[in-house]
Curated annotation (Swiss-Prot):
It is found in: Cytoplasm. Residues 7-67 form the CSD domain. GO terms for molecular function: DNA binding. This is Cold shock-like protein CspA. The keyword Lipoprotein does not apply. Keywords: Activator, Cytoplasm, DNA-binding, Transcription, Transcription regulation. The gene is cspA. PANTHER family: COLD SHOCK DOMAIN CONTAINING PROTEINS. One of its GO terms (cellular component) is cytosol. The keyword Calcium does not apply.
Length: 70
């Protein structure tokens, strides 16, 4: 799907291991799972933190992968 999308962490719950990123371009909020956070070498995401990510689709739903801190 799309690559190098800029977004802001809307919320991330490290207990539930997921959250959502608000796309800077105004698109739909994107699901982010702990596996993507771990793969980026991060421990967690903070609300309001800017990230760059790629979109992938699985079972008809978009989710963030290849996270990088902006």
């Amino acid at each position: 799907m799309a690559t190098n999308i800029v977004g802001k962490v809307k919320w991330y719950n490290s207990t539930k291991n997921f959250g959502f990123i608000e796309q800077e371009n105004g698109g739909k909020d994107v699901f982010v799972h702990k596996s993507a956070v771990d793969a980026a070498g991060l421990h967690s995401l903070e609300e309001g933190q800017y990230v760059i990510f790629d979109l992938e689709e699985k079972q008809g739903k978009a989710y963030a992968v290849n996270l990088r801190i902006k």
